Amino acid sequence: MLLSRNLRALAAIHLWIVYLLLEDLLGTCAEGDNQRLVASAPYQDIEITLEKPRVQAVAEPHTLRYDLMALSLEVPGLPQFLTLRYFDDEPFLPYKKNSSITDSQEPRIKDHLRAETWGRETDDLQEEEEQLKGMLAEITAQNGQNTDLHILQATFGCELQRNGSTRGFWKLGYDGQNFLTFDQKTLTWTVDGPSTQKNKTFWKTRAPRADLVKTFLDDICPAQLQRYLASLRNGLLNTGFPKVIVTFRNYPVGRITLTCRAFRLYTRVATLTWLQYRKPVQQKTFGSETILPSGDGTYQAWVSIRVLPGQESQFSCNLKHGNHNINEPAATEAPVYGARREQPPTSGVGSRVGKSLWSAMTTALVVISWTLSQKLMGPLLWFCSGGFCSFLQCW
């Protein structure tokens, strides 16, 4: 039984690591309110020196999220502690227990934060590690699970909404299952799922103090989010001007498909408009749920229209993005009909490796699941939600 439990926990860890890799490199989809597990930050008394951000309306919501994971035992090839931070679902500042290096995957953020601010962020990760490890040790000792492999996960953060207000979220998970959620309105912890009163009391007494969590969600996290947002605004010149490209190809029924692609978008809001004789005929506005990440911290979007052969010169594409207003003609030379024009390669790391990476990572996921389930535990059904994965064994 001990071996079986360890193997099951190890399988859950491998799947969770694969999930993180997919999310980091391919981007994530928008989920419902606070569906991710996050953990740690101020488990102990701290002195608050940050001013509460001034309420100010924004064009689009922004999110700062922390994902943490701690293992009760050392597993070869896996970090015993892992932290990932996300700004608007873009990963940056990974931290692993077995590595003394903490580096940003989003250089625009690091380059424009003061050195002392960046150092404080790194120090916080080490404190969070100790707090999460201590909580995990206490839980396993209380339940007599010291010799088994167990996982404690946490997810917390805050969202800056369009009206300038903020809301926070904080969840804890154990062995792939949600077990504690913080209610920001009542300032209490709730135990997820059915549980005895004794278990509820046990979990609640091990949770971070409500007053410290409130301070983090109401003050510290929004202030950090505002700093990251300001650093991106100050670093917009690093992205260069947005780039607009128009391509065309023959359509089988006597039409030409014009495609307008916009690259190097530094926020998740943009509007693309097709103009005929400088008058709008088709317009699409992209937001956080429809714009595409390029994989390098910028975004991209595209829109197509079908026209009659010979009309290409009548059309142009207009991009409105921040302070930029760019017009690109649909045709600068006579098109060659009868042959499909090759589309230019999409810029950005994510687009260059997206298909091959998705194939490789999907294969890895299948191999891991199949190998572990068939050779070690029998058929399994996997369920993943908000970064937490659980499984049912099929007999």
From Swiss-Prot:
Location relative to the cell: Cell membrane
Region Disordered: start-end pairs: 332-352
Region feature (Alpha-2): 149-240
Keywords for the protein's UniProt record, in alphabetical order: Cell membrane, Disulfide bond, Glycoprotein, GPI-anchor, Lipoprotein, Membrane, Signal
Keyword Glycoprotein on entry: yes
SUPFAM superfamilies assigned to the protein according to its UniProt record, in alphabetical order: Immunoglobulin, MHC antigen-recognition domain
Organism of provenance: Mus musculus
Start and end residues of each Ig-like C1-type domain: 242-333
Main location: membrane
Residues bearing carbohydrate: N98, N163, N199
Gene3D superfamilies noted in UniProt: Immunoglobulins (2.60.40.10), MHC class I-like antigen recognition-like (3.30.500.10)
Region (Alpha-3): 241-337
Family listed: Belongs to the MHC class I family.
GO cellular component entries: external side of plasma membrane
Name of the coding gene: Mill1
Subunit composition and interactions: Heterodimer with B2M.
Protein name, entry field: MHC class I-like protein MILL1
Lipid attachment points (GPI-anchor amidated serine): S369
Topology of the protein relative to the lipid bilayer: Lipid-anchor; GPI-anchor
Region (Alpha-1), start-end ranges: 57-148
Cystine residue pairs: C158-C221, C260-C317
Pfam families found in the cross-reference section: C1-set (PF07654), MHC_I (PF00129)
InterPro entries: Ig-like_dom (IPR007110), Ig-like_dom_sf (IPR036179), Ig-like_fold (IPR013783), Ig_C1-set (IPR003597), MHC_class-I_related (IPR050208), MHC_I-like_Ag-recog (IPR011161), MHC_I-like_Ag-recog_sf (IPR037055), MHC_I/II-like_Ag-recog (IPR011162)
Region of interest called Connecting peptide, as start-end residue ranges on this chain: 338-368
Tissues expressed in: Expressed in stomach, intestine, uterus, skeletal muscle and heart.
PTM entry text: N-glycosylated.
Extent of the signal sequence: 1-32
Positions of the pro-segment in this chain: 370-395
